Amino acid sequence: MFSRDVRLETYDPELAKAIAAEAGRQEDHVELIASENYCSPLVMEAQGSQLTNKYAEGYPGKRYYGGCEFVDIAEQLAIDRIKQVFGADYANVQPHSGSQANQAVYLALLQPGDTILGMSLAHGGHLTHGAKVNVSGKLFYAVQYGVNEQGLIDYDEVQRLATEHKPKMVVAGFSAYSQKIDWARFRAIADSVGAYLFVDMAHIAGLVAAGVYPSPMEHAHVVTSTTHKTLRGPRGGIIVAKGASEELQKKLQSIVFPGIQGGPLMHVIAAKAVAFKEALEPAFKTYQQQVVKNAQAMANTLIARGYKIVSGGTENHLMLVDMIGRDVSGKDAEAALGKAHITVNKNSVPNDPRSPFVTSGLRLGTPAITTRGYQEQDSIDLANWIADVLDAPTDEAVLAKVRDAVTAQCKRYPVYG
C-alpha cells in the first residue's frame, strides 16, 4: 500500500505499538550497553530520507546506474569528512556493518587458510577476530592472544605467538577491554614477522576522533570501525587508512564492491555524513572527555563497593565487572538490573568458569548516558544503584527502590524529549 496520507499507527498498529514502546524504553531505562548510543535527530532525519530509494552500485563518479548525481554528493561528503576526522588519506564508507568491514579487510589481504593473530573473544576480543564460530575463524587459521593476571594485554605473549606462528595478519582491537592499547608495540610485532597490522577500533572510534584515546592511524596498515557506538552515528561500518599504497587501496575498494556487497545503503551513508560532521565539532571532544570521566567515576564507585573491575579500572568508555566466585551470574545480574530499568549485557570475563550463555561478568559503558547529559555524580549514583541490585538481585523491594530512582534520573535527562 502506497499512501501519502495514512500514518503507520493506522496502517500497521502492531508495528507502531512496538516502535512506540521501544521509544519509551529508551527514555525511561538507562542504557549502559557499551556498544549502544543515541544518534542525533539530524542523523535520523538523513537516514529516513528519500535516499533510501536509490540504487547506486559503484563509487562516486563511477556508478552502474543513472540518476546518482545527488547520492554521489552525499557519499563524497561522508568520505571527505571521515578522512578529516581520523587524518586518513583513504576511506570507504560503504560497509553495511563493522563485521562486513572486517570481512572485507580479511578477504582483500589474505587467502583462505592463512594465519591470523587476534585477541581471544573470552579475553575481550570480538567474534570477527578469529573466533571459531565466526567466518574469520573458519576461513583462516586463527591464533588467539589474551590478557595476563592483571587483565592487561600481554605483549610478550603476542610477540611469542607471532614468532611461533608467523601470521599474515595481526589483529588489534577489542569489544571488552578497558585500557589503552600500545599501537606502536603491535606494529613492531607485526613488522617482526612481515605481517599486516589490522586495527578494529569500533568501540573507541569516537574517543580516537576526539583525541582522548591514542590513534592507530599512524601504525596500522588498515583500520575499520562501526559508525555507531562512541562515534554516535547510524549503524554501519567504515574502512580507513593512512599511507596505504595504491595497490592496497584498490584491493580494499574492489573487495567491498563488487567483492562482498552490491548496492550501498545511500540513506545510511547520508546519515554517516551527518555524524562525521558532528564528530568534527568542538562539542564532540567535550562529549568524549565526559564519556571517559563518567566511566572512571562508575568504575571507581563499583570498586569501592567491593566489585572487581577487570584490569583494575578504565581508560576508555567501558568496564568489565568480574563476578567470579559470587553467587550471582552475569545472566542473572543482567535480568535483575533490567527489572530496575538498567540495561546492561552479561559478558564473559578472563578465565570464566561459566558458559558464554551464563557468564560471570557484566560489561558496562557510558556513551549513551553521556549523550543524555550525565555527569560524574550521576554516574556515581548509578554505580551505587547497580551495586545495590548486585548485592540483592532477588530482593523485590531493592529492585523497586532502584527502579524509581533510575526513572527519576532518566526524566531529568530525556533523550529526545
Curated annotation (Swiss-Prot):
It is an enzyme of class 2 (transferase). Its EC number is 2.1.2.1. Keywords: Amino-acid biosynthesis, Cytoplasm, One-carbon metabolism, Pyridoxal phosphate, Transferase. InterPro entries: PyrdxlP-dep_Trfase (IPR015424), PyrdxlP-dep_Trfase_major (IPR015421), PyrdxlP-dep_Trfase_small (IPR015422), Ser_HO-MeTrfase (IPR001085), Ser_HO-MeTrfase-like (IPR049943), Ser_HO-MeTrfase_PLP_BS (IPR019798), SHMT-like_dom (IPR039429). The keyword Transmembrane does not apply. The modification N6-(pyridoxal phosphate)lysine is found at residue 229. PROSITE patterns: SHMT. GO terms for cellular component: cytosol. GO terms for molecular function: glycine hydroxymethyltransferase activity; pyridoxal phosphate binding. (6S)-5,6,7,8-tetrahydrofolate binds at residues 121, 125-127, 355-357. Pathway: One-carbon metabolism; tetrahydrofolate interconversion; Amino-acid biosynthesis; glycine biosynthesis; glycine from L-serine: step 1/1. Its cofactor is pyridoxal 5'-phosphate. It comes from the Bacteria. Belongs to the SHMT family. This is Serine hydroxymethyltransferase. It comes from Xanthomonas euvesicatoria pv. vesicatoria (strain 85-10). The lineage of its organism: Bacteria, Pseudomonadati, Pseudomonadota, Gammaproteobacteria, Lysobacterales.
